[in-house]
Structure formats: structure tokens, C-alpha cells
């Protein structure tokens, strides 16, 4: 079926110009009017919000000269909660517009993974790519796609669960119906960035009472991280990684809000549902994110218990809602994982063995015999799964290879192999650590340029340049850091002294750590040496957020200690003149 924009000959009713076009224009006009009215109300409330007494920047009434210069004057500026949120919001909007609105902006390049996502969310190549197939693969940024059906209501529910990108994609389709044209990943990027910004601003608002002035630098650091070009490229693409930062940030924001709100609040019903939606976004971003399901269930169960009502009937209803949310998230996550098994499982297993384990084995012949692989397949060692079929002894999808390889070599077979060969496993783990030092620029480029591997980016790379300072270069360093952090969090959780909010935040830290740690071995053990840096994306994202959180906690603890020491020194200095006079 030829696909052009949103029109197809297979769906004549849906493209009838006498029905759809006028309806689209009518809805578009109504949306514009509603947007103007809503915008006016929001702007008015924002101005009132920022003009109230508590939200102003309290400037001390003194001149710069009288206070010892401009620096001393600026130190006396008191930043409020609403002012902090407003500054972080302005910085986020400025970063997004600066990097995505120019004609030359960053985007993702198809490395072969787009097809899997396009099939799941019902997207197809637009006419220019159909006319020239060379532009479909590692050519450059492609932002315009076509689709047959405007909406898929079943895929938005547990009836037909699919990748979580389906949710923002439906909003993009609706906008496309109103404006005409193709499905645009640039519009998709702005929608995803809006969700990330909303989560970040909610975090800044909720954490201000705990962190005070530290909230602003922490919020700006996270903004520079998630809105840098290395992360923006994923939003403007059809990679599975697109929804991971969205789901993770929404999960963190909802968890912090639930942890800090009064226990048993009526609003906890709504926020439990929002938390379930957030973890669903995270666990179904791509198939391998199913490993985050245990952490998601822990969060849902803990807050179901923590916020349970005291009355009997509301308690039963709240408990049933928590159980239902856990069941739906689990069902959708496992459903998405099962869907993906038939799509890429064979290629993944191939690369794990021939492009990974056998390449580092001291005796490849013995390793092949141990894994039950025929000796005639030895020439395939070192080949990834995307060469032409003529390059292999047996084609990747052939029945012969199914019988000789796939029928008895599975992911669990490879796990057992590495457990029997700890030296090889350590080699692969160290490889993963080396790949996690820098954020990769593979499979991303600017819209006006042809793709070249690891092309340098030139707009917003502050976080990319800084993160190599605290990234480990060996596996044992990660074991030491994460082991120490895990023991510290468990101590906080099981000690009686800390407040319950502190215990809940420590549990969140452990859950984010779990999500990242579970992705660490998959990058190399589960995919060999193929796209290691891309496969480490989730781990690096979790690691970066954990580093910022740990840094804020450390500074927060050092500030009271420093003040206590200064007060002790001051008191000691005051006592000395008194002793001399006596």
C-alpha cells in the first residue's frame, strides 16, 4: 500500500476531504481559541504567582559599595521556592529553543533499530525515503514519517500493550491531523522535553524545603544534563532509548512527591496512578527495560502501604487499586517483552556469542564445543548480525542455523558460560566500564549534514565534558562505589532514627541504582561488542542522576558540619579574652 502523509488508498473513508479536512480545521480553530484563552489565564496566574510577597527575590536594601562590593551584595540575595522554580524553567525553555528550533539541530540516525519501533507504533517511511532506500540507513537525520491509521486506541491500553513511545506519538498524530504534513520527530521531541521539564520542575519545587539554596544549582545541573545535545538527539529519534529519561524522571518526581506529602493524603490516590503511568513508561520504553519491573513494583507496593487510609472501606479500595496498578504494569511490561522476542532475540544471541564471548575466549575451539556450536562455524567469529547472508556459513535467519545454533544456545546458556569463566566475564565488565566514561555521539548528527560516526557536537556539551571526571574506568570501582552507597541506603532504611521521608528517599535511590545496575551487564554480555556505548545509555543516565543526588546530599551534610566547626572556633575565641582578664 502506498503511503503518503496520513492518506492511504486502503482507508478512503478516513481521508475523505469532505469529512476529515473540515473537521480537522474546526478542531484546529477550537484548539487555537482554547490555547489563547488558557494561555491568558496561565500567564495571569503566573504573574500573580511570581508577584506575591513570598515569591520575590528579597534584595537587601544596601548599596554594593557599602556591603563590600558586588559579590558580597549578591551573596545576600535570598532565593525563594517559586523564584527557584521560575529560574530553572526559564533555563530549560531557553536550552530547548536554542538547540531544537534552528534549521541545523541535532537528531538521531537510524542504525537499523528504527524499524522495530516503527512497526510497533505504526509508522512508515515517507515518500523521499521510499524513492531512495539509501537514505533509510545511516544516511542522516530523518524527521518526517508516514502512517496509515491516525489513532490506535487499543495500543494505549493493556489490550494490546506496546512500546511507551506510542503515547506521545498519538499526540503528534493529532497535531498532524490539524496542521497537515507528516509525523514529525521534532514535534515529538518537544512533547517529550515538556514531560521531562515538568518532572524536573516538580522535583525542584518539592525538594526546596529540604535543600534550600542548593536546589537551584542542583536543578540547573540536571537541566544541563538532560537537555544537552547528547540527550536531545534521542528525543528526536525513534530509538527505544527515547522514552527512558522521560519515564525515569517522571518516576523520580512522583516518588519524591509521594514521599514528602502528608501520609494518607487524599491526593495520594491521584499520585499513585501517576506513579503507575510513569513506571509503565519506563518499563516499556524498550524490551530490555523489563528488568526494571522489580524496582517499579517495589515503589508501587511501598507507597500503597505507606499512604493507606485509616478507615476500613477506603483502605480496601486503596489496596485494591494498588494491586490493580501492579498487575497492569506487570502485564504490559511482560507483553512488550514477549512481542520483542521474535524481532531481535536471534540477532542479540548471535552477537553475544560470535561478536562477544568467542572473540575473547582463550581457546575458541573449546568454547564452541562447550556451547555446542559446530566447528565449521568458526569463520563467523568476529562478525556481527547485520552482514549480508553470503558472509556467513549459515544465514542468520536460516533453518540450518536454527537447528545448529539457536535451538540449544540461549541467553541463559551464555550466562552459565560466563559464570564458568569468570575471567572472560571480568573482561567484558571492564569493557563496559570503559564504554561508560563518555557519552557517545554515535548515531546522531545535525539535520543539515550527512552522518559520520562520532561527529563532534558544538552546542550544549557541558555535561558531556564534565561526566568523565567521576566516571569509573574499571569494573571494581563501580562495585566499590555502588556497594558503599547501597550499604549506606540500607542502613538509613533499617535504622529507627531517620524520619520516614528519609527512608523513602533512600529507597528511591536504591531503586534507581537497581535499574542502572541491571542494564550494566546487558551492554556486553547480552550484545557482545555491538554498540556498547549505546547499550550503556540507561546505566549512564542512572549513574549521572545518582552522582548529582549523592553530591547534593554530601554538600548538604558538610554545610552544617562546617557551621558547627565555625561556631566552636568562635566560642573558643570568645572564651580566651575572658580567661586572660580573669
Language model segments and positions:
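Helix-boundary/low-complexity linker signature
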Residues: 11, 577-579
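Short, Lys/Arg-enriched, Gly/Pro-containing loop segments at transmembrane-helix junctions
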Residues: 48-58, 561-572
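Hydrophobic transmembrane helix bundles of membrane-integrated enzymes that assemble
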Residues: 16-29, 33-49, 58, 65-104, ...
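Membrane-proximal, non-transmembrane alpha-helical segments
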Residues: 428-481
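TM-lumen/periplasm interface segments of multi-pass membrane proteins
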Residues: 100-185, 452-459
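Membrane-proximal stem/loop segments at transmembrane-domain junctions that anchor or position
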Residues: 118-156, 338-451
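Cytosolic nucleotide-binding catalytic cores of signal-transduction proteins
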Residues: 582
Amino acid at each position: 500500500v502506498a503511503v503518503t502523509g496520513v492518506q492511504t488508498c486502503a482507508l478512503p473513508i478516513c481521508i475523505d476531504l469532505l469529512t476529515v479536512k473540515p473537521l480537522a480545521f474546526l478542531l484546529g480553530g477550537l484548539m487555537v481559541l482554547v490555547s489563547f484563552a488558557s494561555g491568558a489565564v496561565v500567564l495571569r496566574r503566573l504573574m500573580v504567582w511570581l508577584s506575591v510577597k513570598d515569591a520575590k527575590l528579597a534584595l537587601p536594601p544596601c548599596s554594593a559599595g557599602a556591603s563590600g562590593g558586588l559579590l558580597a551584595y549578591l551573596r545576600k540575595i535570598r532565593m525563594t521556592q517559586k523564584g527557584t522554580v521560575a529560574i530553572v524553567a526559564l533555563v530549560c525553555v531557553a536550552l530547548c529553543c536554542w538547540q531544537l528550533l534552528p534549521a541545523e539541530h541535532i537528531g538521531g540516525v537510524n542504525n537499523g533499530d528504527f524499524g522495530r519501533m516503527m512497526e510497533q507504533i505504526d509508522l512508515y517511511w515517507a515518500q523521499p525515503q521510499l524513492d531512495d532506500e539509501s537514505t533509510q540507513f545511516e544516511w542522516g537525520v530523518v524527521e518526517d514519517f508516514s502512517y496509515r491509521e491516525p489513532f490506535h486506541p487499543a495500543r494505549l491500553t493493556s489490550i494490546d500493550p506496546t512500546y511507551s513511545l506510542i503515547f506521545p506519538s498519538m499526540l503528534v498524530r493529532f497535531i498532524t491531523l490539524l496542521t497537515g504534513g507528516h509525523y514529525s520527530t521534532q514535534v515529538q521531541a518537544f512533547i517529550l522535553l515538556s514531560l521531562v521539564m515538568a518532572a524536573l520542575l516538580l522535583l525542584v519545587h518539592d525538594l526546596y524545603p529540604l535543600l534550600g539554596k542548593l536546589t537551584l544549582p542542583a536543578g540547573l545541573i540536571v537541566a544541563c544534563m538532560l537537555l544537552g545535545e547528547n540527550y536531545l538527539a534521542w528525543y528526536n529519534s525513534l530509538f527505544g532509548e527515547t522514552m527512558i529519561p522521560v519515564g525515569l524522571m517522571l518516576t523520580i518526581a512522583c516518588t519524591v512527591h509521594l514521599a514528602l506529602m502528608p501520609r494518607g493524603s487524599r491526593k495520594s490516590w491521584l499520585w499513585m496512578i501517576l506513579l503507575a503511568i510513569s513506571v509503565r513508561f519506563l518499563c516499556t520504553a524498550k524490551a530490555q527495560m523489563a528488568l526494571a519491573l522489580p524496582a517499579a513494583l517495589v515503589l508501587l507496593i511501598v507507597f500503597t502501604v505507606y499512604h493507606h487510609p485509616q478507615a476500613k472501606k477506603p483502605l480496601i479500595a486503596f489496596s485494591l487499586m494498588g494491586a490493580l496498578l501492579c498487575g497492569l504494569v506487570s502485564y504490559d511490561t511482560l507483553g512488550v517483552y514477549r512481542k520483542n522476542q521474535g524481532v531481535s532475540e536471534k540477532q542479540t544471541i548471535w552477537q553475544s556469542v560470535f561478536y562477544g564471548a568467542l572473540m575473547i575466549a582463550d581457546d575458541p575451539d573449546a568454547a564452541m564445543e562447550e556451547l555446542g556450536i559446530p566447528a565449521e562455524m568458526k569463520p563467523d567469529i568476529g562478525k556481527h548480525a547485520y552482514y549480508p547472508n553470503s558472509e556467513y556459513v549459515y544465514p542468520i535467519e536460516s533453518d540450518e542455523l536454527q537447528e545448529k545454533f539457536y535451538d540449544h544456545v540461549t541467553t541463559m546458556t551464555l550466562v552459565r558460560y560466563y559464570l564458568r569463566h569468570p575471567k572472560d566475564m571480568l573482561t567484558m565488565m571492564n569493557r563496559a566500564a570503559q564504554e561508560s566514561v563518555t557519552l557517545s555521539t554515535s548515531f546522531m548528527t545535525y539535520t543539515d549534514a550527512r552522518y559520520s560516526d562520532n561527529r563532534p557536537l558544538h552546542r550544549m556539551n557541558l555535561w558531556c565534558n564534565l561526566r568523565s571526571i567521576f566516571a569509573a574506568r574499571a569494573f571494581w570501582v563501580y562495585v566499590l562505589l555502588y556497594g558503599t552507597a547501597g550499604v549506606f541506603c540500607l542502613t538509613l532504611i533499617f535504622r529507627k532514627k531517620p524520619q520516614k521521608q528519609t527512608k523513602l528517599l533512600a529507597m528511591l535511590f536504591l531503586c534507581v541504582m537497581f535499574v542502572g545496575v541491571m542494564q550494566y551487564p546487558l551492554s556486553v554480555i547480552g550484545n557482545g561488542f555491538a554498540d556498547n556505548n549505546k547499550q550503556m545509555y540507561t546505566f549512564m543516565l542512572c549513574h549521572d542522576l545518582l552522582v548529582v543526588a549523592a553530591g547534593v546530599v554530601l554538600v548538604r551534610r558538610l554545610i552544617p558540619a562546617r557551621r558547627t566547626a565555625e561556631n566552636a572556633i568562635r566560642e573558643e575565641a570568645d572564651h580566651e579574652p575572658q580567661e586572660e582578664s580573669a
